[in-house]
């Protein structure tokens, strides 16, 4: 059996521009592509944290070190400059590959420079203010004890 698994993601990147009159795709800084193991032409899902939009497109390499995350074509109706997005690539793997594979998770700063690399898809960097599902039972217990 084959399974579709998260291969890599760039988490909370800031959209630098959106161009409606482009042929499509998302332009991504080549440094981020390398960190996330993305290839030009590879399919990605873009999740807009600000408005909840989800869309699929493909990656085009942007200038290395530029921090570019450019939304191109019709997707510019859904995702605007300044929006925070998650870019997710999936891979189809057999059972053995699933057990051996470690995804690439790239957290970026406000300038879209990588600040943390990892393999845990549910990890939240310390000090980020993000909540990981692995913390929910602890948070629920803290909330309950504060109500008593």
From Swiss-Prot:
GO molecular function: aspartate 1-decarboxylase activity
Keywords: Autocatalytic cleavage, Cytoplasm, Decarboxylase, Lyase, Pantothenate biosynthesis, Pyruvate, Schiff base, Zymogen
InterPro entries membership: Asp_de-COase-like_dom_sf, Asp_decarbox
GO process annotations (BP): alanine biosynthetic process; pantothenate biosynthetic process
Involved pathway(s): Cofactor biosynthesis; (R)-pantothenate biosynthesis; beta-alanine from L-aspartate: step 1/1
Catalytic activity: L-aspartate + H(+) = beta-alanine + CO2
Subunit structure: Heterooctamer of four alpha and four beta subunits.
Protein name as it appears in the record: Aspartate 1-decarboxylase
Source species: Rhodococcus jostii (strain RHA1)
